[in-house]
Amino acid sequence: SFESIIPFIVTAPLGRLTFYVEHYPWIDFKSHMKEILDFLEGSLVSDVHSHKLETSVLDNSTSSSYNPVSGMLFVNDLLTMTVVNFFGCNSRLNSYHRFDMTKLDINTFLKALADAFKKIANYLEV
């Protein structure tokens, strides 16, 4: 008997997207899932728009940063890792990578994100 105060949990272990959703007979499950997907997409888009990558050289940085002179990227958060990996970086958390940040096109990333959510909604038939 799973009990929680969180109405849903979304995980993606090893890239396998999994939804844990509490279901009640008085709630329309399809519209509920549509609201969850809309919320998740809105949150991700907002996070992408508000994300800032440090470009000054800092010793012992705890946040992701990029040195435009050397082309070295320090990846220390999931959002940076996801975006640069989308553009071919193959980065890992808490590591340095040589990467050309001019390859990034956030509009292309956001379009792919929107397309992914449409595919998920179609798959779930919501």
Swiss-Prot record:
Its principal location? Answer: virion
Q: Which UniProt keywords apply?
A: DNA-directed RNA polymerase, Nucleotidyltransferase, Transcription, Transferase, Virion
Q: What class of enzyme is it?
A: transferase
Where does it reside? Answer: Virion
Q: Sorted alphabetically, which InterPro entries does this protein's record hold?
A: DNA-dir_RNA_pol_35kDa_poxviral (IPR005059)
Catalyzes what? RNA(n) + a ribonucleoside 5'-triphosphate = RNA(n+1) + diphosphate
Sorted alphabetically, the Gene Ontology cellular component annotations on this record are: DNA-directed RNA polymerase complex; virion component
Q: EC number(s) in its UniProt entry?
A: 2.7.7.6
**Gene Ontology MF term list:** DNA binding; DNA-directed RNA polymerase activity
From the UniProt record, give one GO term of the biological process aspect. Answer: viral transcription
A Pfam family assignment: Pox_RNA_pol_35
Q: What does this protein do?
A: Part of the DNA-dependent RNA polymerase which catalyzes the transcription of viral DNA into RNA using the four ribonucleoside triphosphates as substrates. Responsible for the transcription of early, intermediate and late genes. DNA-dependent RNA polymerase associates with the early transcription factor (ETF) thereby allowing the early genes transcription. Late transcription, and probably also intermediate transcription, require newly synthesized RNA polymerase.
The entry's family comment says: Belongs to the poxviridae DNA-directed RNA polymerase 35 kDa subunit family.
Outline the subunit composition: The DNA-dependent RNA polymerase used for intermediate and late genes expression consists of eight subunits 147 kDa, 133 kDa, 35 kDa, 30 kDa, 22 kDa, 19 kDa, 18 kDa and 7 kDa totalling more than 500 kDa in mass. The same holoenzyme, with the addition of the transcription-specificity factor RAP94, is used for early gene expression.
Protein's recorded name = DNA-directed RNA polymerase 35 kDa subunit
Q: What species is this protein from?
A: Sheeppox virus (strain KS-1) (SPPV)
The encoding gene: RPO35
